[in-house]
Amino acid sequence: MKLMGLDVGSRTVGVAVSDALGWTAQGVEIIRINEDEEQFGLDRVGELIASHDVQGFVVGLPKNMNNSLGPRAEASKRYGDMLTARFNLPVDFEDERLTTVEAERMLVEQADTSRRKRKQVIDKLAAGLILQNYLDRHGKLTREK
């Protein structure tokens, strides 16, 4: 079962897709969105579902360090609800605390990437980390429709 991992922000959504066996995650792209104008990039998500034969979603849930849910986590949950309503595919959530920090560290230490280039790929890499963490923990989508 191929899964799509999503790192949802207020201006971008990082997208990653798993392999068919659910072992590895690969960053795919960054979709520009605008929450204020209710432009959530769902048409592009639909195109990616079709082209990658995706059968479920893992959405990053940015919990606070004390495990509570703040405004960004609530926005991610709403995005998950929109995915369910639009595509009728199962959605699960993965704690994404510090994945963007980890992604930035990887880009600096391992790829020696400039700040400008990091901004262009960080959300895609974070989505890959969210999905890979989920796959490592669960192996497949654990929440059904």
From Swiss-Prot:
Keyword flag Ribonucleoprotein: no
InterPro entries: RNaseH-like_sf, YqgF, YqgF/RNaseH-like_dom, YqgF/RNaseH-like_dom_sf
Enzyme Commission number(s) from the entry: 3.1.-.-
Gene3D superfamilies per UniProt: YqgF/RNase H-like domain
Molecular-function GO term, any one: nuclease activity
EC class (word): hydrolase
Cellular compartment(s): Cytoplasm
Coiled-coil ranges from the UniProt annotation: none
Any single GO BP term: rRNA 5'-end processing
Major place of residence: cytoplasm
GO cellular component, one term: cytosol
UniProt keyword Protease present: no
Protein family according to the UniProt entry: Belongs to the YqgF nuclease family.
Function text: Could be a nuclease involved in processing of the 5'-end of pre-16S rRNA.
Protein name: Putative pre-16S rRNA nuclease
